[in-house]
């Protein structure tokens, strides 16, 4: 059975001033799979995903979701297209509650008064409980630990009911127990036929979670492979652009 592409990004280019951040990048993500995106710092991974999330606009290229072209020029477009992104840096309002952060931008809840806010709190808590996230929906975000705030970022993506969820280094501030919980969430998402794009540099995560892996280098696509067809050495070689045996030349006795 051939895996179906949930996302195709074709010929994506982006420059900032005279700096080419992305050059003719092609990227695919497969439905119901964990699609790992790798590359050294500055390879263009986060920039590419910010294009998908509507945070920045590309200079060239097209995006297809489920085979249909979509125009994503702002975050609202990405949300409407079923895309959610969990950023490495926290994007929360510390003085607001967990529930309010999960529904940030949903004016239907805020404009309808106490009854809908109360119902929204119940829905938020139900979602947190459903995914075994030990967070109180009524708590102020400023009272949460950094790890709890990172899990809240993930909960925000879950609350949007997105079909494509991008996670940018999501385990960077998590404890071992929370990493295990995150992996369980990811497995559940893929079992629901949702697509996960997972940016990571941690090899153990890549091989534990990944179904496909794509590598970028210097703002360009290098390749895409089923995880079963790569090794740690081959991935490192793809990221750095040369055989890693050349990085540690043999000593002559």
Predicted regions: what is each one?
Residues 2-253:
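Glycine-rich phosphate-binding loops of nucleotide-dependent enzymes
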């Amino acid at each position: 059975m051939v895996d179906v592409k949930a996302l195709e990004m074709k010929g994506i280019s982006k420059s900032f001033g005279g700096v080419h951040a992305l050059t003719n990048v092609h990227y695919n993500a497969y439905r119901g799979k964990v699609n790992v995106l790798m590359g050294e710092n500055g390879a263009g991974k986060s920039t590419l995903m910010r294009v998908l999330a509507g945070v920045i606009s590309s200079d060239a290229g097209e995006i297809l979701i489920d085979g249909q072209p979509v125009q994503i020029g702002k975050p609202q477009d990405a949300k409407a297209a079923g895309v959610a992104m969990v950023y490495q840096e926290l994007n929360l309002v510390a003085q607001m509650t967990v529930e309010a952060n999960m529904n940030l931008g949903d004016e239907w809840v805020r404009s309808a008064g106490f009854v809908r806010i109360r119902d929204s709190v119940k829905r938020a808590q139900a979602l947190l409980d459903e995914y075994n996230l030990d967070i109180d929906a009524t708590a102020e975000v400023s009272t949460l630990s950094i790890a709890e705030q990172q899990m809240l970022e993930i909960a925000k993506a879950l609350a949007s009911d997105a079909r494509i969820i991008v996670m940018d280094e999501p385990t960077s501030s998590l404890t071992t127990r929370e990493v295990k919980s995150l992996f369980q969430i990811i497995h559940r998402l893929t079992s629901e036929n949702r697509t996960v794009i997972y940016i990571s540099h941690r090899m153990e995560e890549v091989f534990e979670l990944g179904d496909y892996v794509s590598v970028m280098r210097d703002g360009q696509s290098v390749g895409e492979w089923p995880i079963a067809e790569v090794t740690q050495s081959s991935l490192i070689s793809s990221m750095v652009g040369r055989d890693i045996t050349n990085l540690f030349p043999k000593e002559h006795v």
